[in-house]
Amino acid sequence: NSDFFIMEKISGSAEGHKLVRLKDETLQQKILKDIGQRLADLHQIETDAEIEKILPKPQKETYLSDLIADLYAQLDKLQRHRPVLEFALSWILHEKPVIDDLVLIHGDYRIGNIMINQDHVSGILDWEFSHWGDRREDIGWFTAKCWRFGQDNQIAGGIGAYKNFMQAYAERTEIYIPEFELKFWHILSHVRWAIIAMQQSNRNQNNTQASLELALTEFLVPQLEKNILDIIGEKE
């Protein structure tokens, strides 16, 4: 016997490369608004005794230091010599922002993990990275250049303007995160994705899961490193 769960079947598409290339701008804006409001709803979930059993809330004062330390440990375990990633980890360690509050975050909220059915969000996938953290961690991940699927001028997930996304988010939360606050979180997002890409490549190399897609994922790392250097070099 083993644990299991039953899910409701949902309709829709999570194909990021198609969603960011929709020709109907009005449709894109409607979808983007729903994406922003769904994230806002998630960030307003409060903890309780049952949630604490499976997802305990960390200390606000140590959450970010612990997250960065975990990334250092993951990179060390990979046994790769990646000076740019090491430099980026040093940068984010010394540039940590003040954390005002911890909310329930998805951890991988991006185009590709959001099911779209016609003009609305029908489901959100891949919750294995969920944890308590700063809301900007989710917002930074969703808007990071590495998750825009080539539509770099559309900061909000490759499908729309940042202000439209945040206005939808603010309608539910009364919180609007200015874009200039995301520099730290964008660098963190790129470092994290680079580490995940190398971990996925290892799964193929170690014969854990033979997959051409996993094998090729590591080739994303140099571009991620270039993005990191570009972001660090941007003037405030």
Question: Which role fits each region the language model picked out?
Answer:
Residues N206, L216-E236:
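Regulatory N- and C-terminal appendages and interdomain linkers associated
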Residues N1-F87, W91-D101, H120:
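ATP-binding pocket architecture of kinase catalytic cores
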Residues D3, L42, F87-I139, T143:
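Active-site acidic catalytic loop and adjacent metal/ATP-binding pocket
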Residues L55, Y176-L188:
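All-alpha amphipathic helical-bundle segments outside canonical DNA-binding/catalytic cores
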Residues S13-A14, L39, H43-E50, R82, ...:
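A general structural signal marking secondary-structure boundaries and capping sites
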Residues K53-I54, S201-T217:
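Hydrophobic/aromatic-rich alpha-helical bundle segments in the mid-to-C-terminal region
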Residues E137-E174, L188-N207:
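Active-site activation/catalytic loop segments of kinase-like enzymes and analogous catalytic loops
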Residues G16-K23, R148-G157, E213:
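Short, flexible, glycine-rich and Lys/Arg-enriched loop motifs at helix boundaries
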